[in-house]
């Protein structure tokens, strides 16, 4: 049975608490010559809600001379600006992460355990600001140093480094590709100070869908242990 960190999410999900978030949603069409920063700006400006499926590969550094270990999970994601999102992990373990605008909830079905944090304190300068919170590119640049990187894997890339270096997050790389509907935010790569690397790829993307309010509501299941931080 997996254990929950005393002060946070399960180890495999620590990057998601730092980010929680993360998504890849199609953007309105942008010129073919547009760079990664242009695509990011269009995403923030024009995408108010979205949903997608995702696969997450978390690579942890090896210990005592052992090679690195990689664990893969998949699930679904939805978000609505400002400040609401939901991750539902299906395999190999069921977990739910919900930000309702006030509280960040993590439910581990295997442990029947809920962790609740004040959302403003839990997110801060994290990937969630890019996906669900920041109103414009200038707001992001107050918290991140944003630089374009060379194309890789058929995608345009941006590197985002938090200006506040007091957390676990080291940097975020965001990859865009050109799809049938224009630029798509396709990949999110996150590195932390423990040497852990998380790569999320997205599929079955829907842009600006009408999402029910219940998507971003969470009620702890009966009998669940609740930890509040």
Model-inferred region functions:
Residues 125-139:
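Short, solvent-exposed helix-to-loop capping segments enriched in aromatics
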Residues 54, 85-88, 104-107, 160, ...:
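Short hydrophobic/aromatic-rich beta-strand segments that constitute the beta-sheet cores
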Residues 14-28:
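Bacterial N-terminal signal peptides
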Residues 27-70, 220-229:
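N-terminal leader/targeting segments and the immediate start of mature chains
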Residues 45-101:
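N-terminal mature ectodomain segment of secretory-pathway/periplasmic proteins
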Residues 1-12:
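N-terminal secretory signal peptides that target proteins for export/translocation
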Residues 35, 115, 139-229:
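Gly/Pro-enriched, hydrophobic low-complexity segments
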Residues 76-128, 198:
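An acidic-aromatic
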């Amino acid at each position: 049975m997996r254990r929950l960190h005393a002060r946070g999410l399960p180890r495999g999900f620590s990057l998601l608490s730092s980010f929680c978030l993360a998504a890849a949603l199609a953007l309105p069409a942008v010129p073919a010559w547009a760079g990664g920063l242009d695509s990011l700006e269009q995403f923030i400006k024009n995408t108010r809600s979205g949903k997608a499926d995702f696969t997450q590969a978390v690579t942890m550094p090896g210990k005592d001379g052992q090679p690195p270990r990689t664990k893969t999970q998949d699930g679904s994601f939805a978000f609505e600006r400002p400040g609401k999102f939901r991750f539902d992990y299906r395999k190999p373990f069921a977990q739910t992460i919900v930000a309702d605008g006030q509280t960040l909830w993590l439910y581990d079905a295997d442990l029947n355990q809920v962790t609740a944090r004040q959302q403003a304190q839990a997110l801060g300068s994290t990937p969630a600001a890019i996906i669900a919170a920041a109103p414009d590119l200038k707001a992001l640049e107050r918290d991140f140093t944003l630089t374009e990187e060379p194309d890789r894997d058929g995608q345009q890339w941006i590197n985002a480094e938090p200006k506040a270096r007091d957390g676990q997050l080291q940097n975020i790389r965001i990859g865009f590709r050109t799809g049938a509907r224009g630029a798509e935010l396709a990949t999110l790569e996150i590195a932390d100070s423990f040497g852990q690397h998380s790569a999320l790829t997205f599929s079955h993307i829907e842009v600006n869908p009408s999402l029910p309010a219940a998507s971003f509501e969470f009620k702890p299941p009966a009998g669940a242990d609740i930890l509040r931080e």
